[in-house]
Amino acid sequence: MTLSFPPAAWWGIMVAYPDLPGQTNKGVHMASQPFPELFQPGRIGEMTLRNRIVMPPMGTNFAEPDGSIGQRSIDYYEARARGGVGLVIVEVTGVELSRGKTIRRQIGIDDDKFVDGLSRLSEAIHRHGARSAIQIHHAGRLGHAVEPIAPSSVMLPPSHRTPREMTGGEIEEMIGRYAAGARRARLAGFDGVEIH
């Protein structure tokens, strides 16, 4: 089978390379600009973005062992904001770290103790003109807890265990955990929340 793709100019390829001595190209050059709207301000509800480039949430494993934000996380996200992204969405942030983690060093938002670090993170993103959102998350049946939980007891093959089906009360409690996570995100200065 042969795959064919449109010419690179159609994709709007961005090429990054170091400046040569005596040049002031800032290291990033557009090979073409077939989508000029991409670089225009955009809106999500009442929120205005400087452009329509969005960095999606991607798990980095950069959180501190207890789920707090350290300098490595701040540096990582600040670099993306400095690079010109319009909206930075911070990775999988646990609403229940004790039994809802997907990755070992996952950011936490299930306790007020995390708000200060998350505030420093949102401030670092905002400092460079980007907007910030945070993805709040519970692993459910994908969790690594002793007893994973989910709305139904359906296993995710091939390597996960069958989760315990949540009770109605546990589902209500989980809704409350997401609401509390969203409240903490707002207290920390994030412009939006993505529910995972």
Give the residues covered by each predicted segment.
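Flavin-dependent oxidoreductase catalytic cores
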Residues: 10-196
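Serine residues within intrinsically disordered or low-complexity segments
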Residues: 4-5
